[in-house]
């Protein structure tokens, strides 16, 4: 006889609950287990959102934040498609905390009304993730890398036909006038195009990745791991808070304009970064040739630029091809290494770095024809120059001592052209990959709006999403996912 077992209501509920938990997507369970969004929301944000004045909130703050983070983690291109996913996925809707799916206008108003609060969430996450970055790789976490780009706005001037029409007209004009090959229709087009979009003067013309576009310009500071540390949005508010920035009229060279503008934005951007995060104190700066100016080296490497005796120790910046280095006694190559007085193509050998009693650092370079000779009688080695046309009477050959503090541009705390320089400077590309990542994978590109606050919020949310990724990767002990957790979704 088969024994009869009566099912209780508790058993049925337990089975249903277990089935519900097992059917929940694994990635959402991972986020739910390891990320406490409440800990990351400043109390000021909560007070602002749930203010005593106005209507009662139908949708909770955490629900909006989770929805916008999921939006970017899953690379959902539009807000409307996100709402469609929420409508058809009960597990996603319940994970975010929505009882009912909000309208698209609610998402837009949330971004615009709470932009400053989203910035506070981002700044909080920067401080949370700094110890994680230090634990993963302290050398790379000690680096600061800066680059700028732009968010293309949804305006007429960004239609490819707009620029192509002007270029086509200029090519036809050049052909009719019989101009020679030195005439560049692309530079001429840049000069003839308006400096800002007709719909909004804050949408500026910029030359990015080989094409003209009209954008809201922004700057990003990352560390050597490629983790975002700071975001600056270069709008009227930024310019008003930094009146020392002088905006000049554009020239006929788009590349030159971008270099000049970036060099003026660097120090104000870094000052904002260090004022928000005084405990972060990196010692190495990496930047492209746009920052190769004597004044920038002085600001980066000396004084109280970023606080009381707070500055970088090294700056990895390649020399700009338009301006070289000069010395009356001997020539200096493009890497800042002294060359033989009789043969400028022969660079001297770097022999080491030493410090004087006064604490001043100096680099030592010796004749490239010099060799160490071992004397068996004294059991010691000594230098000997084997040059056929010596530039000095010394048997050791010519020696040159370089004092970096006298010429920070030539010797910014490190030696160009060395293996260490090459290996370190390669790391700079992480900021470019980061910009491409937040545009393509975190859905910053292709936004069909020209509203400044909406696009600014989208930029901040992209930064928040990346830092949430860092926290999650650390919680599950998979640091290889600090920049992207797409493998976990699959």
Show which residues each predicted segment covers.
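Major-groove recognition helix of helix-turn-helix-like DNA-binding domains
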Residues: 96-113
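Basic, amphipathic alpha-helical segments enriched in Lys/Arg and hydrophobic/aromatic residues
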Residues: 423-490
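DNA-recognition alpha helix
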Residues: 80-95
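Basic, short loop/linker segments at the boundary and entry of helix-turn-helix/winged-helix-like folds
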Residues: 26-74
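An internal, acidic/charged active-site-proximal segment
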Residues: 255-256, 262-375
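Short amphipathic alpha-helical "interface-anchor" segments enriched in bulky aromatics
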Residues: 35, 86-87, 150, 329-366, ...
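Polybasic low-complexity intrinsically disordered regions
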Residues: 113-285, 289, 294-302, 306-312
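Charged, often Cys/His-bearing segments associated with DNA-binding zinc-finger transcription factors
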Residues: 1-45, 476-490
């Amino acid at each position: 006889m088969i024994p009869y077992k009566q099912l209780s209501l508790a058993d049925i509920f337990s089975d249903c609950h277990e089935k519900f938990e097992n059917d929940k997507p694994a990635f959402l369970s991972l986020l739910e287990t390891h990320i406490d969004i409440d800990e990351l929301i400043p109390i000021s944000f909560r007070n602002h959102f749930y203010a005593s004045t106005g209507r009662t909130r139908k949708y909770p703050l955490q629900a909006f934040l989770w929805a916008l983070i999921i939006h970017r983690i899953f690379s959902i291109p539009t807000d409307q498609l996100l709402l469609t996913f929420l409508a058809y996925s009960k597990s996603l809707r319940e994970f975010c905390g929505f009882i009912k799916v909000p309208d698209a206008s609610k998402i837009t108003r949330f971004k615009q009304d709470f932009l400053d609060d989203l910035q506070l969430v981002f700044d909080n996450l920067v401080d949370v993730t700094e110890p994680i970055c230090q634990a993963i790789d302290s050398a790379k976490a000690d680096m600061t890398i800066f680059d700028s780009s732009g968010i293309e706005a949804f305006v007429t001037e960004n239609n490819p036909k707009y620029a192509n029409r002007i270029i086509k007209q200029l090519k036809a004009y050049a052909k009719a006038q019989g101009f020679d090959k030195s005439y560049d229709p692309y530079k001429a087009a840049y000069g003839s195009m308006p400096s800002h979009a007709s719909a909004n003067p804050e949408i500026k013309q910029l030359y990015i990745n080989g094409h003209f576009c009209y954008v809201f310009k922004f700057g990003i500071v990352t560390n050597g791991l490629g983790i975002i540390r700071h975001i600056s949005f270069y709008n009227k508010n930024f310019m008003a808070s930094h009146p020392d920035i002088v905006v000049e009229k554009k020239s006929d060279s788009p590349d030159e304009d971008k270099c000049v503008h970036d060099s003026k934005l660097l120090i104000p951007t870094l000052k904002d970064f260090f004022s928000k995060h005084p405990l972060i104190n990196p010692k190495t700066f990496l930047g492209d040739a746009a920052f190769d100016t004597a004044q920038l080296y002085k600001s980066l490497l000396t004084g109280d630029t970023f606080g009381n005796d707070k500055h970088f120790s090294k700056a990895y910046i390649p020399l700009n091809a338009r301006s070289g280095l000069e010395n009356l006694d001997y020539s200096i190559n493009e890497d800042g290494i002294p060359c033989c007085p009789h043969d400028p193509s022969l660079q001297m050998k770097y022999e080491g770095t030493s410090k004087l009693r006064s604490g001043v650092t100096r680099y030592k370079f010796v004749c490239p024809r010099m060799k160490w000779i071992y004397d068996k009688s004294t059991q010691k080695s000594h230098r000997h120059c084997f040059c056929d046309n010596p530039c000095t009477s010394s048997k050791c050959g010519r020696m040159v001592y370089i004092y970096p503090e006298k010429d920070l541009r030539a010797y910014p705390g490190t030696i160009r052209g060395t293996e260490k320089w090459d290996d370190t400077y390669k790391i700079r590309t992480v900021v470019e990959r980061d910009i491409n990542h937040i545009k393509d994978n975190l859905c910053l590109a292709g936004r069909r709006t020209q509203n400044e606050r909406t696009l600014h919020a989208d930029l901040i949310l992209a930064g928040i999403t990346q830092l949430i990724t860092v926290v999650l990767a650390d919680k599950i002990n998979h640091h290889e996912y600090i920049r992207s957790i797409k493998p976990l979704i699959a």
